[in-house]
Amino acid sequence: MIQVLLVTICLAVFPYQGSSIILGSGNVNDYEVVYPRKVTALPKGAAQPKYEDTMQYEFKVNGEPVVLHLEKNKGLFSEDYSETHYSPDGREITTYPPVEDHCYYHGRIQNDADSTASISACNGLKGHFKLQGEMYLIEPLELSDSEAHAVFKYENVEKEDEAPKMCGVTQNWESYEPIKKASQLNLTPEQQRYLNTKKYIELVIVADNVMVKKYTSNSTAIRTRIYACVNTLNLIYRAFNIHIALVGIEIWSNKDLINVISASNVTLDLFGNWRRRVLLRRKRHDNAQLLTAIDLDGPTIGLARVGSMCDPKCSTGIVQDHSKLDVMVAVTMAHELAHNLGINHDGNQCNCGGNPCIMSATLNFEPAYRFSDCSRDEHWRYLIDNRPPCILNKPLITDIVSPPVCGNYFVEVGEECDCGLPAHCQNPCCNAATCKLRPGTQCEDGECCEQCQFTSAGTECRAAKSECDIAESCTGQSADCPTDNFQRNGRPCLNNNGYCYNGKCPTLDHQCISFFGSSATVAPDVCFNLNLKGEGNFYCRRENTRIFPCAPQDKKCGRLFCVLGPTGNTISCQATSSQSNVDIGMVDLGTKCGDGRVCNSNRQCVDVNTAY
């Protein structure tokens, strides 16, 4: 039998009311000094880790005792988490720091069912918690007594800037058809299973060089800022059954790798190009957010492409580091990430139960922690219509050496499910007290799990997206849909106008339409002769600054040329290029370049039977 030893640290609690103080969070007009009392339950003789899996702190707020329960956010980092920075001479330096014993926690206030908390315990307690419907912040005081903390309401923090702050996404609500509520959607069983399946977003955050200067080249401060934001991001997205794992951060310590300017739409486009061309080749991830300290144009503090999750270029966002408060920047990042997940701004008809809404176009002065009914319905509709594939891939989870914690919403070693604490669990398949499946059940989540049982073999769980894709069906032996496969590369498609390549049917005409609109078509051969010169933007291959002209047989694998509508007696060769991304405007790999021939990775037009 395990004996439990209660260890109490810092027994005294001396509340003190202050009128005004300058803290890391800003100027605070009214605050309370508290000395949190930490109570830890440890097995007798057990070695105490640096940061325990669960902790409790007792202190007083407004003279009333509260108990803050904390549980380590074990899924904060992926197993292959990495950090990249650059030496003064521009060399890329990537490290894989140990992150198992980190100090970031989620939590709740005892006897307050609606409470939440996002706390860093790295050097004292720093973060925020919700108590009786109000947002409080806590942070250590820099006093000789290191246990002293300030607790204060968010409303008592002096606003840094009274000017309105807004998201850069623009839309005209009146132009949209009314959104069907989730209850009105006529879902098939397969669609309902997909919605119920837990989703995962593998996130990379890039800090630009202005961030480096703002934090005086203190990479620890930048990392701490990012970790705190993602910890809060995770808490917010529980509402959508989405787990966010930080797989990497990149700090542009030497110089910006793109031209970061105040025009947010331009910067976002450049960042997306860089992500597709550079970052994705180096680091597997689903979404990347650029955290910048530049002052974006006008009231804009963030921008993202709506409905772009998993897209190589557009699954990105830009977030301005606009506040001293971690929570305000985290809420902005949650807002932009929601755009990637197909969610637009809330209209007047949207409801958050009397609380500020995350998807308000204008930033609320009080941190918004809730998605509206409109946001939920739009997100569900986006998932059903688009099925972004990357968010079903479970990230590699850091191998935790400490025991699993039942009730932290994260399935760890030895657990079969984890639906939170018994008071919050709404999963009929899972025993919240043991984190084991209930007797007679086979599963609790997955595209091939229905009413706690494996779906029958042969039931379609992923429809084919095109004639080059393959529909997948449940095996009857697993809750997971089989790996997404597609037709063999080189199979004819679109009435022999193209050949399948990685599940798609790339053609020159379709690429012209994507660049120039529905009236665009591929240009005559005479335009492609420009690729034979190997000058300027017209070539087949590029190695650093050296360009190589196309051989005559390869000219339709270099720069793409299009025409817009009827040409008459004059041919106007249209092409596009980008200084920041040399691949923009080039013919896609796998595109048909002649009968029985396709463009390979060396931009050569080769026999389709030997290309793959």
UniProtKB/Swiss-Prot annotation:
Amino acids binding Ca(2+) 1: E202, D286, C390, N393
Localization annotation: Secreted
Listed name of the protein: Zinc metalloproteinase-disintegrin-like 2d
Annotated source species: Crotalus adamanteus
Additional remarks: The disintegrin domain belongs to the long disintegrin subfamily.
Motif (D/ECD-tripeptide): 467-469
Annotated GO CC locations: extracellular region; plasma membrane
Family classification: Belongs to the venom metalloproteinase (M12B) family. P-III subfamily.
